[in-house]
């Protein structure tokens, strides 16, 4: 499991990092916390978004981490996952689009992805879970929005969260969906999808941009791992 930090997040721990580490010990998986290139400009952002298939700097970095860890540990290559927070969440959708031949699933909080991604070809299969506060003041939940008012024009318009969930449901040709509310959280599930994946969303009615300790009564780190752990590629 690779956990990608948010903007300016390289200076501190990943949210619930101690809990992720403890869970990894119990569940026998490896979690790694990549640090972005500190020399990038504010307009570029710590993680490159909406990169074409020929622009693979961060993707190569993610794969290199997995390859290096595989030289030391016994890793099941069919069970590679990514999570992230904010900008790190946005980057997990680069992995979902461009590294789905290796990674099986992504689950993250408070990100989005471009409305028109440069490259998003399904060579493997990709399960997606996204958690988001509906009162998020940085990453708009309900509407498409322009990335930093044109500072990084290569990224383009970013998707609303409902639009992004629909994108992945269509990408995996999901044939069924259902939803329910619990503790001010809307839970949407798209299933009967290609490759037996699921596309899930937790919309937190009263939450903003900060990483939540719990989602609908379940610790966030546990919810993320419970989802990811269902899938292999």
Give the predicted meaning of each segment.
Residues 134-198, 214-218:
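Active-site-adjacent alpha-helix of alpha/beta-hydrolase-fold enzymes
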């Amino acid at each position: 499991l690779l956990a990608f930090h948010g903007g300016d997040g390289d200076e501190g721990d990943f949210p619930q990092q101690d809990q992720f580490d403890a869970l990894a010990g119990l569940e026998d998986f490896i979690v790694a916390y990549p640090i972005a290139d500190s020399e990038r400009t504010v307009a570029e952002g710590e993680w490159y978004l909406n990169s074409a298939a020929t622009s693979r700097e961060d993707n190569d970095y993610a794969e290199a981490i997995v390859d290096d860890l595989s030289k030391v540990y016994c890793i099941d290559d069919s069970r590679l996952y990514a999570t992230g927070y904010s900008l790190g969440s946005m980057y997990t959708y680069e992995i979902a689009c461009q590294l789905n031949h290796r990674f099986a699933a992504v689950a993250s909080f408070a990100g989005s992805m471009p409305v028109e991604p440069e490259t998003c070809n399904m060579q493997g299969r990709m399960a997606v879970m996204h958690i988001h506060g509906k009162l998020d003041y940085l990453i708009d939940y309900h509407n498409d929005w322009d990335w930093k008012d044109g500072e990084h024009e290569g990224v383009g318009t970013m998707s609303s969260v409902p639009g992004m969930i629909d994108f992945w449901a269509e990408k995996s040709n999901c044939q069924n969906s259902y939803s329910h509310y619990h503790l001010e959280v809307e839970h949407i599930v798209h299933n009967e999808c290609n490759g037996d994946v699921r596309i899930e969303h937790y919309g937190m009615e009263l939450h903003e941009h900060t990483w939540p300790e719990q989602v609908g009564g379940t610790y966030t780190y546990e919810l993320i791992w419970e989802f990811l752990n269902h899938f292999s590629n």
